[in-house]
Amino acid sequence: MPDYFVHESSYVDDGAIVGAGTKIWHFSHVMPGAVIGERCNLGQNVVVMPRTRIGNNVKIQNNVSIYEGVELEDDVFCGPSCVFTNVINPRSHVSRKAEYLPTVVRRGATIGANATIICGSTLGAYSFVGAGAVPPRDAPD
């Protein structure tokens, strides 16, 4: 029996790693190759893709997708419906999987509701991205 909680409407695929004390709420999906630390809280409708890393004590609010290439260090807060991208110029007819850019959110950073984080960015330790913001560059510590 796992030492974390998964709501009955959610899925944690084989090959995903989830730390002790983590809670995964309604309609969420953690895919193989995702790593989630201890004591995290994933709200409703959260998707965590392969090759992502989420630290300890991270809170991800409802309707957030953590796409391949995103790393959230310890104590990060992701507000409701914030968005991470992983391709600079997506096109439906062109595969860009080889062009995914890493995004790093450093320890203790806060991302407000409906903010969009452009791939290739680093948000510094304890930085604060306001609700609805689209930071055009890295955010310092």
What are these regions (language model features)?
Residues P2-E8, D14-A16, K23-L123, A131-A133, ...:
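Flexible, glycine/small-residue-enriched loop-and-beta-strand segment within the central core
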Residues Y126:
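P-loop NTP-binding/switch modules centered on Walker-like glycine-rich loops
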